[in-house]
Every structure is written in structure tokens, then in C-alpha cells.
């Protein structure tokens, strides 16, 4: 028998054994219970260190490596929300393909030998469009989101039941041999419950009862729910949860969201949370009896298409997480936390079974000590002083504790880790640009829309309508158009002066066109959504067209009665006429939903849309309302790819019909003269999102993640819709190179 045949048989035999072992393991049922100390999975108490990875914020081709990188980082569980509006885009019509293949994602977690924490919600917040709730539900009569009313409860229970039954069918809950060990109903409702009165309390209790009745065989949680009933576990979200205690003494201490960074908005600066402070918060939590901890986010990913919420949340949801948006470890954060996890797990049994005592060792100094009957001992030494390093005596040995740090001593003698002493390597990140290339020479196809109504108006009203109630979020865009007649006797025509256009809007953004010429843009921001525009306008004698393109930039995703938050214009007037101010608010307005190219689906591969495209090697610059199409080759190498849009204004991008998302390299500005950006972050002291900000005067998002799996080997169709004007010749594909230093 030749060598090739022998090796083939051996390989096949090994594969059969591996498949058998995995199959045996995957069907091994494990009951999940809990007491005040921890979860018990099967017959073993376990500490859980979980990594949040939202399946629709990456692509299926990335899921295995993301899960594996989390496992290599010392995590033993993956957590995700379930995204209702992605799964039920219309009533009773479900979708589980592509990025929304939740079953495939959970099975990848299972194949990695990890646990799964599933937060079904189905309200999720998450800086996700409309908090994950389908927009259509707002228009079901009698519906108030997250409140005690029949329509909301009917659809919430219906979706929850559908998801639970799907996962039961796939045997994904732990008692069935699956990886799911915990589930969550609702999300941070405690913040808002009082705003709904007694009905809020009834709804919270109903939510818990409805969830428990699903009989999934694993515990249910409610985060930030201080009146959670005995049947569910109340849990903590925040930057620090060491002082948290569940609302009844029989429940374990669970931290559902530790924020290792923060989200970003278009026009906002870059928030940073140092690795030392993240590690400090985790060590304090486990030192104080915590047993389940989840990083929100461990990999933030990307808000592809129109999925970002806020409004104004960027397409990037990087979150400065341990795994970056592109799927690469962020060093030193990933490495430092890996070292922390290893140190914590050295004392796993003591932390969940041993006797806990707390000792004061001096001003702002304390020790949390765990022992068992055999004399085994572990200690967490904390320096709570946010300015001064300190020497501390513990069991006749001196230890040096930097300010705001925790040392872990798994044997009460040897310091194996200190949260402020970073030994992990760091990384240098570069975005290496490549010009767009085509196998047959780069040729652009260009189609420019005319401002205002195309075809027939959708409707006409003598008032300004709410943007969201009109579009129902089927598009970002809504045209408000009207016209005025200017007498040749107006003084401003004779003097050569300009009247002033005044516009007020509830948000989010507006492009103004006068007589088909782009006049300018006005916008809100992530901290103040409404805005006003005041701009001189050139009018002529006779008829003048006023075309206003209102845009949403993601819908509100949280807050009491947030579904009632509107957008769009509330008043329009022009000052400077002979008779004073011309109020156009109640004039005759014609409306059109969306832009023409959307309706024609020009973003679909090979779709000409029955419009006349101009073919050119030099596409026009600074031209608003323009569609650009170009066929390109994939960039060289295998590194992750970002689309560099620094030369463009604002719009949407697609590759081979896949939605890259909104682009807007809006400059990050200070909110007030007192706001500052920093060069270095001081980890010491309590973290808040505005504590350590960088990026003043820089684009809030320059690069837009394009997953490698979206590229074909050749002939890739890149489509850009530019709203206000840019230079497409300078668009580049940049490869993300990370070097360890």
C-alpha cells in the first residue's frame, strides 16, 4: 500500500473519530441552574467571561475567526442580541439569510466549544435603527412600544415565541445539548419604567412571565430591572458593576454590559477607554463576587446599510473593542484582557465556591480574599486611589499597587497580574491605499438626478409633514418642494441684495436647492438633533423653485416613547421682501419619497435602471445627486479592506449589490469652546464617554469596511450615490495592516 493511500486512510480515521467526539459532545444535555454564587452548568459551577459579537454587524465569512479570536482571548461565551427588525421586516414575514442567519452563528459558537448568551429582547437599543423594533409596528393601531397594551404585547410575544421555537427545533438550548445557557427578555427597561406609570410595572412583570412561560430550560435575565420578579435574574450594565447586587439574595451577580469603549457619531470625536481601566473594572467585579461578565462590545463590527440608529451613529460600530471593526485583535487591549482572564480563571473554583472576606489595608486600599476548607487562598488587592501609587502590606509581604489598580494573587502570595501593568504588545495600524483598478481600464458610468420631484408627486399638502411618518423608514430621503413667484418690483432685485431663507427642522439633515442649484446643507448632530438653517438666497423675478431634500441618519433607538420622535421640516420662511417675511410653512408643498435611483434600484448589479448613463474616464466633481458606477478588481493581498471616502461629501455605497452603508466624512468638532481633545489618555479614575476624546478637526469616519467575502475574483461593481458633491477620482480601497510593536 503506497504512502499516499496510508496517509489518506489515517486522516479519514482521525476525522471520523473527531466527528464522533464532537457529535457526542454537541448532544450532551446540560441543565443550567443558579444560586447566589454562580451558574451551574451540568454538574459544575462556572465563571463566565463573555464576548458580545452581533451577528448582523459582521458577515458569515468572518464569524468563525471572530469567535475563535474571542476564545483565544480567554472568553468562554459569546453574547448577542436578536435583531427583530432584521428578522421580521414585514408582519409575519421572516428572514434568516446572510448576516441574519442566527442559527448558523450559534452553531459556530457551539463548534468552538463555547457557551452562548442570547438576549432576545426583542427591544435591543444597541445604537441599532429603531432599537431593533420593526417600524411597521408603530403604525399598528393602539400600539405603544414597551408598554401594557395588547398590540405591542401580541407582536412581542409572537416574535419571541417564533425565535424560541426555531432555536428549540435546532436543539440549541443547553438542556438539548446546545450552547445557549442564558437568555434575556426586555432591555434596560428600569430606566424608563416609571415614565409609563403603573402600566410600566405591569408590562415589566408581564414580560418576565411571558419569557419564563417559553420553557427554554435556561435562566432568563432582565438587565437594569430593579423590580425584576423572582423568576428572572436582575443584572447590571455600566462602566463599573463591582458594587452591584441583584435585587434578591438568591441570584448570582451578573454584568451584562461592560463597555470597553463607546460608540461614535457622525461629526463626533473618537472616545477611548484605556485597557488598564477596563481590566480594573473586570477585576473589581470578580473580586467582589461577580460570576458572569460580558464585554459590550468585544467586537463591535459595522452598521451595514441603514441599520445604524441614534440618530447619527456612524457606519462603523468599532466601539474601540478588543477585536476591531475589521476582525483584528486591538493591542494592547485584547492582549491585556487575555492576561487578565487567565489570571482570574486560576482561581475560578475559589471565586464561586470559597468563603469571601473583605479587609481594609489602609486608606483607599482593600483586599478581597477567598479561602476554602483546605486552606487554599486567592486575593484581589485594590488601590482605589485615582492619583497615587501605594505600597500595601498583605500577609507580611509588601506589594506595589499603581493608582486605580487591582493585583491578583491566586495563591495569596504571588502577584500574577496587575490591571495597570500592561505587558501585552501593542499594535500599529495602517490603512494602505490602493487606487481603484479595472482589468479593462477604469471607466465610470455617471447618472445625475435633477433636484426635486421626479415623475409625479406622491402627494400634495398645504403643510409640512413629518418625515418619518411619511417615509415609514423605507428610505432616508424625502423631498419637500414648492415654488414662489417673485415680483420684478422687489427691492432686493434692484439693490442686488439677497433675501434670507430660514428653515427649522426636527432633524436630521437637509440639502437645499434653489432653482435646481445646490445652496447648502444644514444638520443636527448626535447631541442635538433639531437644527435651523439661515442662508442668503439668490432669487430671480418670476417663478423660483425651492427643493428641500430632508434626510434621516438612523432612527432613535432608546428612550421613553422614543417611537414618537419625529423628523423633518417644521417651518420655512424667506425674509427680505417688500412686504416683510414670506411664510411658506402652509404653502402648497409637493412630496416625493426617496430619490430616483433608489426606486430604479441602480445599486443592483447590472441594472441600468432604464436611465441614460454617461460613460467617462473622468467623472464630474462636486456634482450633487449623482450616481457613480465603476467595475473594479479586488485589492491585492488578504488584509481587511476599507473604502476611503475622504474625497466625497455624503451618501450611500454598495459593492456587488451589498450595502456598505452611509458614508459621511463629516469633520469632528467640539460641542463647546471648553471641549478638548487629548494626546494621551489617563486610565486613572472613573471613566465616562467624554473623558478621553481624540480626532478634533478630523473626519469622524473616513474608511468604510468592505468585507473581503463581498468581492468576486474580478468584475466587482462599486456604486456610489453622492448627495452633495465630491471627487470620485480620489476614492480608494485601503488595506488594513496591523503590525505588532
Swiss-Prot record:
Taxonomic placement: Eukaryota, Viridiplantae, Streptophyta, Embryophyta, Tracheophyta
Pfam family of the protein (one): BetaGal_gal-bd
Sequence similarity: Belongs to the glycosyl hydrolase 35 family.
Glycosylation positions in this chain: 31, 358, 396, 469, 525, 583
Catalytic activity: Hydrolysis of terminal non-reducing beta-D-galactose residues in beta-D-galactosides
Enzyme class: hydrolase
PROSITE patterns in the cross-refs: GLYCOSYL_HYDROL_F35
Residue numbers annotated as active site: 188, 257
Alphabetically ordered keywords of this record: Apoplast, Glycoprotein, Glycosidase, Hydrolase, Secreted, Signal
GO terms classed as biological process: carbohydrate metabolic process
InterPro entries in the cross-refs: BetaGal_gal-bd, Galactose-bd-like_sf, GHD, Gly_Hdrlase_35_cat, Glyco_hydro_35_CS, Glycoside_Hdrlase_35, Glycoside_hydrolase_SF
Compartments where found: Secreted, Extracellular space, Apoplast
Any GO molecular function: beta-galactosidase activity
Full protein name: Beta-galactosidase 10
Secretion signal span: 1-29
Assigned EC number: 3.2.1.23
Entry GO CC: apoplast; plastid
Tissues in which the protein is found: Ubiquitous.
Gene that encodes the chain: BGAL10
Main location per the UniProt record: secreted
